[in-house]
From Swiss-Prot:
This is DNA mismatch repair protein MutS. It comes from Prochlorococcus marinus (strain MIT 9312). GO terms for biological process: mismatch repair. This protein is involved in the repair of mismatches in DNA. It is possible that it carries out the mismatch recognition step. This protein has a weak ATPase activity. SUPFAM superfamilies: DNA repair protein MutS, domain I, DNA repair protein MutS, domain II, DNA repair protein MutS, domain III, P-loop containing nucleoside triphosphate hydrolases. It holds the Pfam family MutS_III.
């Protein structure tokens, strides 16, 4: 059987093995909707739970390389005369002029094509063939490059990753078949890095933020006021904030990790680029950040009469940024502000983010503590998130990532999260049942978003239904929980019955495994729609007619293996083996000759073929209408689906943390509120461990250590040799603090932890080439930021200060900084240093204590125990550490001689003094 044919019986899902000829009554033609309904009632169809068979996806090959001869003047759409272009190219240029900064993919037949500069660009970006196209007699050939229509999403994903925006111009109607008749085309989608909703273009476990920044026009860097609004259009999340000073704005921008940042002018772009030249911005000069426009757009979008109801009263900068964001989204998707439209971007009410209700972790601290990525290689493996993420859903993974970005300050809210973890730990069966429920759950947040935007496929709706059907079982698990639980669990205990009804409706209408392409048909169950059932009855009748026609032609020709088959290009035909050609009757019309096969058509078959195509087309159109109505029903429940999805995500995040706790022997810490005056700055961790390093060690045992902060011990001077574990210990304290404040259990035997308002770190330093700052200046800038912003409730982690200058200058700065932190700020601080002279600070400061990393020395060999104990060290073991690192022996021996000489000189100088 040839690959380019499809057996007719498979096409209609009819068994053709029975060769007995049946008498067929005349098939009715041109039935109205009412006639089809009556036909359906005469012969009701029985529901079948069958699996829809989809042909395997075949990748089309891009056209082979050709010698492209292009007139230099025809290279750019800007230089050609539109009057001289063909109608299609004239339309292309018109659309391109409206989207100068975006790549335009224009549908022509089975390909999306680019022309002029865009063609040259995407041929390089996507490594596809650059060819040419005739644009008119006077224009000649122009550059052209294209991608197959069915692979468009994959190629768009590559362009989006390279930070390009794409405009999709698709065919809005099918070809009439009449040569020369223009096909209606129009822009159906604008895809920018921040407005992606397609599954293949998103990172499943990470939010895809689009951000708008409003910056006030002030002169002084510290007097700049700003507003930031960011949204994930795929999940509906919307966050807005405002603040003051460029330094804080720069830090927030780096932490945003946005796919696209919208600003209003090149002046703002130039100002922001001074803070970090590696971040790219989208300048949208037509985007309005005005306060009046913002008020109007926000009220219209959220259908409210006052901004006070969503918390934006008197937050003018946040309001302006949100208005700018909505303004930009309106231009990307013009339907998103039309409340009557079933196709729009759906965003939740904005969450107003304030500094006073979360633990602040600046970008430098995130980087130093390797919270989401490692510092050196920027890898996920080896980060804090990697060490604790055991989530089963993409929603849960994104939720955990958000928690790590913004740990809590409210002790009661933290305890409620701990209580969920406790319930999971106490019952292995409950834990396993929840794992099984969540394991195969789809991404309800993004699935609902695609439905709302009109891009959900039948398979997306099936995934939504399957997820919603699990809600009653999740409810039964939540009802088993004891202790005080978070507010979001109420939604899981009081399920919206309309969501369950929606799930039943989806399952009733859609088959279990629908086709990928909604235009194919075959996705709606029998018995759902009378009109569709009537059309399918007619299709069955025509299928039976073809079966009988095949039997008839076999009898006439006496060719027993004759088949009536179908080809997508020339329809139904009679297929016989070439050896039987002499038996072909006269009424057969030869259609095609192949190596081992002859193909014929007959007048009767061609007449029926037209009717079959009409019925199939009407059936496919009817199925599409039914599906669109179903998708609209889902879209109307987007907010409810996303709301329940967020609760499931939180449950999944806490389930994952409970699994991490069980696997790694974590314990539940006691917490002390910030405003507890009796236990001010009191923190005690017994046998604490670094959660990242412990897992990276695999079978090796991690050395646990204690830490204590109280009124008599606010600043710890930590000394010890390089590679002994000082940095690991410092990071360990910061990581445990973060874990405690997201509600997680922690790696320790016992702990009582004071809530911190900020975590500051200064660990290592390198030149900042983008701003022209030396290592020492970077170090001093970070130190200044800590001293100016830390409070008595902060946690400060310092690993060396003053190394980038002379010994005495560096020691003096380190000494002064230590005293300032201990006496003035009085926050919990660990300062790891090689300046052993700092051990003397203890003598004049009651709240400073010395600790050291123990080292065992055997002749020239040193053994790191990684154990922390009270008391200062007076030796760095630098040469021994260099030897362990593999420094050549000759260099080591020379270093020993130099060290002895320096020590002798130092003694001589002291004696002379």
């Amino acid at each position: 059987m040839k690959e380019d044919t499809i057996i007719q019986k498979n096409l209609f899902a009819i068994d053709n093995e029975n060769n007995e000829q049946k008498e067929i009554t005349k098939i009715p033609e041109d039935l109205s909707w009412e006639d089809l309904k009556k036909e359906s009632q005469k012969r009701p169809r029985q529901r079948k739970n069958t699996t829809n068979l989809i042909n395997k996806f075949k990748t089309d090959l891009i056209s082979k390389n050709k010698n492209v001869c292009i007139n230099e003047e025809s290279y750019s759409y800007k230089t050609v005369s539109k009057l001289k272009l063909t109608p299609v190219m004239k339309h292309y240029v018109t659309l391109k002029e409206e989207n100068k900064d975006r790549l335009l993919l224009y549908r022509l037949g089975d390909f999306f094509e680019c022309f002029f500069e865009d063609a040259v660009l995407i041929s390089n970006l996507l490594e596809i063939t650059l060819t040419s196209k005739d644009a008119g007699k006077e224009i000649g050939k122009i550059p052209m490059a294209g991608v197959p229509y069915h692979a468009m999403e994959r190629y768009c994903a590559d362009l989006i990753k390279k930070n390009y925006s794409v405009v999709i111009c698709d065919q809005l109607e099918k070809s009439s078949g009449n040569y020369g008749t223009p096909i209606k085309r129009g822009i159906t989608r604008i895809i920018t890095p921040g407005t992606v909703i397609e599954e293949g273009m998103l990172i499943a476990k990470k939010n895809n933020w689009i951000t708008a920044i409003y910056l006030s026009e002030e002169n002084s860097n510290e007097s700049y006021e700003w507003g930031i609004s960011k949204a994930d259009v795929s999940t509906g999340e919307l966050i807005t904030m405002e603040g003051q000073s460029l330094s804080k704005l720069f830090d927030e921008i780096i932490k945003l990790d946005s796919s696209e940042i919208i600003i209003g002018s090149n002046e703002v772009r130039n100002l922001l680029m001074n803070g970090n030249s590696q971040i790219s911005y989208t300048v949208s000069q037509e985007t309005n950040f005005g306060i009046n426009e913002a008020n109007y757009l926000i009220k219209k979008y959220f259908q409210i009469v006052s901004l006070e109801g969503i918390g934006l009263k008197n937050l003018n900068n946040a309001t302006r940024s949100l208005g700018g964001l909505l303004n930009y989204l309106k231009k990307i998707n013009p339907l998103n502000l039309d409340k009557d439209s079933s196709v729009k971007i759906s965003l939740d009410f904005p969450q107003i983010q304030f500094c006073h209700n979360k633990l602040i972790i600046d970008y430098q601290t995130q980087k130093n503590l390797e919270i989401k990525n490692t510092q050196r290689e920027n890898n996920y493996v080896g980060s804090l998130l990697w060490s604790i993420d055991r989530t089963y859903t993409c929603m849960g993974a994104r939720c955990l990532r958000r928690w790590i970005d913004s740990p809590l300050l409210n002790v009661n809210e933290i305890y409620k999260r701990q209580n969920i973890i406790s319930n999971f730990i106490e019952s292995k069966q409950v834990r396993m049942d929840t794992q099984n429920l969540l394991r195969a759950m789809g991404d309800l947040e993004r699935l609902a978003g695609r439905a709302c935007a009109g891009h959900a496929s039948p398979r997306d709706l099936i995934a939504i239904a399957e997820g919603l059907k699990k809600l009653p079982r999740i409810k039964s698990i939540i009802e088993l929980f004891k202790y005080d639980l978070p507010d979001w669990t109420d939604q899981l205990k009081n399920i919206d019955e309309e969501l369950l009804e929606l799930a039943d409706t989806i399952s009733f209408q859609l088959i279990e495994h629908p086709p990928l392409n909604i235009s194919e048909g075959g996705m709606i169950h029998d018995g759902v729609d009378n009109i569709l059932d009537g059309l399918r009855n007619l299709m069955d009748d025509y299928s039976e007619w073809l079966n009988q026609e095949e039997l008839k032609e076999r009898k006439i020709s006496k060719i027993s293996n004759l088949k009536i088959q179908f080809h997508k290009n020339f329809g139904y035909y009679i297929s016989i083996n070439k050896s039987k050609v002499n038996l072909a009757p006269q009424h057969w019309i030869k259609r095609q000759t192949l190596t081992n096969e002859e193909r014929y058509i007959t007048t009767d078959i061609k007449n029926k073929e037209n009717k079959i195509f009409q019925i199939k087309s009407r059936a496919s159109s009817r199925e599409y209408e039914i599906f669109c109505e179903l998708r609209k029903m889902v879209a109307e429940k987007t907010k409810q689906i996303r709301s329940i999805a967020k609760s499931i995500a939180s449950l999944d995040a806490l389930l994952g943390l409970s699994i991490t706790s069980v696997e790694n022997n974590f314990i539940k810490p006691a917490l002390i509120p910030i405003n507890d005056s009796q236990k001010k700055n009191s923190t005690k961790i017994i046998a604490g461990r670094n959660p990242i390093v412990e897992q990276l060690l695999n079978d090796k045992k991690f050395t646990a250590n204690d830490i204590c902060f109280d009124d008599n011990q606010k600043l710890i001077i930590l000394t010890g040799p390089n590679a002994s574990g000082k940095s690991c210990f410092i990071r360990q304290i910061g990581l445990i603090q973060i874990l405690a404040q997201i509600g997680s259990f922690i790696p320790a035997n016992k702990a009582e932890i004071k809530i911190a308002d900020r975590i500051f770190t200064r660990i290592g330093a390198v030149d900042d080439q983008s701003s022209g700052q030396s290592t020492f200046m970077v170090e001093m800038s970070e130190t200044a930021s800590i001293l100016n912003q830390a409070t008595s409730s902060s946690l400060v982690l310092l690993d060396e200060i003053g190394r980038g200058t002379s010994t005495f200058d560096g020691l003096s700065i380190a000494w002064s900084v230590s005293e300032y932190l201990a006496k003035k700020i009085k926050c919990n601080t660990i300062f790891a240093t090689h300046y052993h002279e700092l051990n003397y600070l203890k003598n004049s400061n009651k709240n400073i204590e010395n600790f050291q990393v123990l080292v065992e020395q055997n002749n020239d060999q040193i053994i790191f125990s990684h154990k922390i104990k009270k008391g200062g060290s007076n030796k760095s073991y630098g040469i021994e550490a260099a030897k362990l690192a593999g420094v050549p022996r000759e260099v080591i021996e020379k270093a020993k001689l130099v060290l002895n000489s320096l020590e002798e000189n130092n003694k001589f100088n002291k004696n002379n003094d």
